[in-house]
Amino acid sequence: MELHELTLEGARALLLSGEISSKDLTTCLLDRIKTHDADLGAFITVDAAGALEAATAADERIARGEDAPLLGIPLALKDLLCTSGVRTTCASKILENFVPTYDATAVTLLKQAGAVIVGKTNLDEFGMGSSTENSAFHLTRNPWNLDHVPGGSSGGSAAAVAARMCTAALGTDTGGSIRQPASHCGVVGLKPSYGRVSRFGMVAYASSLDQIGPITRTVKDAALMMNVISGHDPKDSTSAAIDKPDFTQAFAGFDAKGLAGMKAGIPREYIGMKGLDPEVERSFKNACKVLEDLGVEVIDVSLPHTNFAVAAYYVLAPSEASANLSRYDGVKYGFRQTGCDDLMDMYKQTRSSGFGPEVKRRIIMGTYALSAGYYDEYYGRASRVRTLIMADFSKAFDQCDIILSPVAPTPAFKIGENVDDPLTMYLGDIFTLSANMAGIPGLSVPCAMSTTGLPIGLQILGRRFDEMSVLKAGYGLEQRCPGLPGLPNL
């Protein structure tokens, strides 16, 4: 097996045994970035010097007999996470040259675990988008077909993992931004429960919805990443003060009894939904059958407020974004427009030039929803719908352990196909965004390839803080599902 084909689990075993070195593995992946990223556009910043320095240090630690969970493993980070001394752009002109003085907590934990950071990946600006076409720097292409999008907003991370330019990556998920690109790129993506992973040092889009999570080659790799990045953080007021399990224990006993005793719900509102691609629906049914063969009891459940989810989300998320992004004004840091008449003119011109069209669209939407006279009509109603959606999931989980659905209504669409149709783009989040509003975990696992050679994923949702059941079911599907994606032919 070539070095770039190693999973995180496989690379870790070979590193600790001395069969490979972190420097060789890191060099191999940096060479792939150099060879392929001009076509893919997965990265905004590549830190080759820093990565090789960290890899050399990891090799020295291994030679001394030291061990750490991710020692010598090359990873990538979505460029929404602060990295000390390495620019963090959020794929926006307004932060094009911003270099943080501190690491996000998740980044700190990765470094403490011995990880090697190869670079920062592309995204839709500030995480606002579903295709990674909204970056101020360049678009990212799907490794399986360069004419198609990789999904978004964590499209750079998903494309980098799929193209074997890093062993694993971190993304962020506000309405499906880990799970949807993972599905489109044929990799595994986990959005943890809200509060499971510290948000400190993540540049906020919608603070009550955002969550950091792993994008990996396998479900086991996702569990290994979760063991490192999860846990309470006093720096983050939304971080949950709960015990952290060993997520790899989710797979204990699988070989002996499969998934016997697990009960999965399929929301009746998702069956035959308008806009659902027939291939996606067929792949979803086949994946459910695989889980049934492993012992899962599949039942019918209801999420009755599904039809209101997209509308509510696209009031709540832009409202929070309009507040979070109000801090970017050209005064203390980031881009500042020159040649302005006065302070107010500088504010206006800086924000007009610094933000892209989709970000400005959502700021306007959010500001309108929060304005006097409209707050109760829009934000208030959307908040009440969110409460109803949370109650729907709570009631459904009284009947089952996990909930199954497609990840996206269609496989990855062509670049430019929906760029002028934001409503169609927003509706593509119908299966994923409810999990963010409910704060529950969601996993995207590859389950099929379309007839046009594009990956399709299955989404597995669980009760809040029950990532274990989600990972266990995902592992079962991964072990038994035929026709899973291999390596893109770059």
From Swiss-Prot:
Lineage: Bacteria, Pseudomonadati, Thermodesulfobacteriota, Desulfobacteria, Desulfobacterales
Function: Allows the formation of correctly charged Gln-tRNA(Gln) through the transamidation of misacylated Glu-tRNA(Gln) in organisms which lack glutaminyl-tRNA synthetase. The reaction takes place in the presence of glutamine and ATP through an activated gamma-phospho-Glu-tRNA(Gln).
EC id: 6.3.5.7
Name of the protein this chain belongs to: Glutamyl-tRNA(Gln) amidotransferase subunit A
GO molecular function: ATP binding; glutaminyl-tRNA synthase (glutamine-hydrolyzing) activity
Keyword presence, Ligase: yes
Entry's family note: Belongs to the amidase family. GatA subfamily.
UniProt catalytic activity: L-glutamyl-tRNA(Gln) + L-glutamine + ATP + H2O = L-glutaminyl-tRNA(Gln) + L-glutamate + ADP + phosphate + H(+)
InterPro entries linked: Amidase (IPR000120), Amidase_CS (IPR020556), Amidase_dom (IPR023631), AS_sf (IPR036928), GatA (IPR004412)
The species this protein was found in: Desulforapulum autotrophicum (strain ATCC 43914 / DSM 3382 / VKM B-1955 / HRM2) (Desulfobacterium autotrophicum)
Keyword field: ATP-binding, Ligase, Nucleotide-binding, Protein biosynthesis
Protein origin, superkingdom: Bacteria
One biological process term in Gene Ontology: translation
Quaternary assembly: Heterotrimer of A, B and C subunits.
Keyword Transmembrane tagged: no
